[in-house]
Amino acid sequence: MKKYKTGLVLLVIALALLVYFSPWFFLHIASWQKEFNQLISENLHQIQNNSIKAGTTLIFASFVYGVLHALGPGHGKFIIASYLSTHESQLKQSTILSLLSSLMQGIVAITATTLLVVVLNLSSRYFKLSQLWLERTALLLLVFLGCYWIWQGLRAYRKKAKLAIKSLNPLPLHEKSAVKNNRTFQPNTCSCGHQHLPSPTQTAQATNLKSQFLVILTIGMRPCSGAIFVLFLAYMLDLYSWGILAVLAMSFGTGLMLSAFAGIVRYARNTAIHLGHWYSSKNTKGKSESIVKLIAGGIMLFFALSLLYGTTISTGGSKILF
């Protein structure tokens, strides 16, 4: 108990310091991103002269750029934090989720640039339009994810607590049957020995897999602008393969930082659960989890609709489609 209280106090102090220094921190993050963006551009130009040295520096600079990109503000951390706050997960599972989400961003950027620029050779105007629709698709997925969590929260909140048997005390048997019974029964199976319906654990696992898939798609469908810039520049310099490697390194750096962030969120959730265990019952725990999921889904839905509306507002110039 004392360990969790100490961890909670340290976490609150860290969050307070982060909020206090966030303007300075994000300003410097943006400045460092510009510097590494310039470094990436310089090394792409130098690869033709010294491919090994410039290429190694390019990959390293792209990796650091991905780390800085993850440290700055973004929708990925918000989605990951919302998911891990409302769903029980293991550390390995949350790490894989963060890495796959970041890798999905890189794959979408590479696929979109390859298809529209390299294969179809479309103009930058059409490419910007495709970026806009990718962003809208990601926001529509975010709307769906928010509605899905709200529905899950409402269903869990209305669900009545089931009666559970805490212990069974068998009576002593004075006589033992001479017939040996070799039949064993597994939970969630009928007398024929087959499982006809999924167990509660399997159902919960399938539901979590759906949510995880939606999280990966929602984050991945909105590629990083830095990755798009690197791919465009690499294509113009006829170094597209180096651009792909740089984007993959960028995605890996982003994924590592998101994994660290996911570990912090998971620790905070477990700490809150352990502290609440002393003054809450199983029924109130289920109700509080459903309320948290409702709030997270509502906030996600609000921001998704606001950002989606923002994509329909013209900021100057004409658009091919709304």
Swiss-Prot record:
GO molecular function: nickel cation transmembrane transporter activity
GO CC annotation: plasma membrane
Membrane-spanning intervals of the chain: 7-27, 54-74, 100-120, 137-157, 228-248, 294-314
Chief localisation class: membrane
Subcellular location: Cell membrane
GO biological process, any: response to nickel cation
Keywords from the named record: Cell membrane, Cobalt, Cobalt transport, Ion transport, Membrane, Nickel, Nickel transport, Transmembrane, Transmembrane helix, Transport
Lipid bilayer topology: Multi-pass membrane protein
Cited InterPro entries: Ni/Co_transpt_high_affinity, NiCoT_RcnA
Key word NAD present: no
Disulfide bonds: none
Pfam families: NicO (PF03824)
Keyword Transport among record annotations: yes
Family (UniProt): Belongs to the NiCoT transporter (TC 2.A.52) family.
Its job: Efflux system for nickel and cobalt.
PANTHER family: NICKEL/COBALT EFFLUX SYSTEM RCNA, NICKEL_COBALT EFFLUX SYSTEM RCNA
Annotated protein name in UniProt: Putative nickel/cobalt efflux system HI_1248
Gene source species: Haemophilus influenzae (strain ATCC 51907 / DSM 11121 / KW20 / Rd)
Taxonomic path: Bacteria, Pseudomonadati, Pseudomonadota, Gammaproteobacteria, Pasteurellales
